[in-house]
Amino acid sequence: RFVFNTCGTVVRHVQVDERYAAGTHASNVARVVLEEQAVAVGALDSVTYASIVREYFEPSVATEIAWRLGVQQAACYDVVSACAGPLVAIETLRGRAATDPHWKRGLVSTASLSEGFLGFDIQSIADLDELAAGLTIGNGATATLVGREPFARGGRIVGSYSEGYPGHHPLCRAPVFGVFRSAGSALFALAELVPDHVRRACARFGWAVEEVDVFVSHQPSDRILREVAQALGVPAARVPQLHSFYANTEASAVPIALRHLVDDGTIQPGMKLLLNSAAAGFTLARVGVVWEG
């Protein structure tokens, strides 16, 4: 109860049917998004899986997603950067767009399925610090389209910026044969790195922090987001806290937050959005977007 109250955890969505793995969930969501955006499967030049890879090492999960969708030919690869995966994948696709004139559009998919990889046997204070974060993890799957031309619904990417702080690598880990463990208090303390990274990202995009209308963020804890808003000197309302709706859905958190804020009317055409994530490793990632509706 202490952990839930501290983070603001109310609901955790979990997968209970073991027949449906990451590739299945990711492709199911992708079909919905492709239909909404009126994009044919054959029009995809790339398929990227941007979640934590948990089920197998080869081939790439992206190839499974593409196969389930019926893609016949496209670049397929995984971008694994823990919770920051989708934003790092978008940055990777921006690089591809800059170097490959034939690339037109790509799919970025996530499927955050953590059941079976979390440990809840808390017997000591040390266990509480290392395992408590797992209590707030929820499951989810998302699909995002990135392309040179506008889609029926979306925004224009103005920049991306990711940076690693590998000195903090030991703080969080999910071994192949084991459960997720995180030095919770030390990892959460790294939130102090976020405001400066946000300022540098905005400067790269030609924005002032005060110009950002909505900070669409990873959702590890409502309290952390409130503290970041205070450190940046922006109203808490511009940093929506959605942890209570979905818990921490790892790599799926930012796309889920974006869809939620579009659907509930928070995000309107013309708004400047800063997509934000932090990940084990330690990695910070930002993508600037002007929403076009």
Task: Show where each model-derived region lies.
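Condensing-enzyme catalytic core mediating Claisen C-C bond formation in acyl metabolism
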Residues: R1-R19, I122-E192, D196, A278, ...
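Claisen-condensing/thiolase-fold acyl-transfer catalytic domains that form or cleave C-C bonds
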Residues: G23, S27-A30, V53-R54, W67, ...
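Phosphate/pyrophosphate-binding loops at sites that engage ATP/ADP/AMP, CoA/4′-phosphopantetheine
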Residues: V29-D45, D196-D213, L232, L261-T266
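Active-site-adjacent elements of ketosynthase-type condensing enzymes
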Residues: R54-T63, T110-A126, Y161-F177, P220-E227, ...
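Short beta-strand segments
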Residues: V80, G106-S112, G138, V146, ...
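Flexible, glycine-rich active-site loops centered on histidine and acidic residues
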Residues: A98-T136
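A contiguous, well-structured pocket-lining segment that forms one wall/lid of small-molecule binding clefts
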Residues: V176-H243
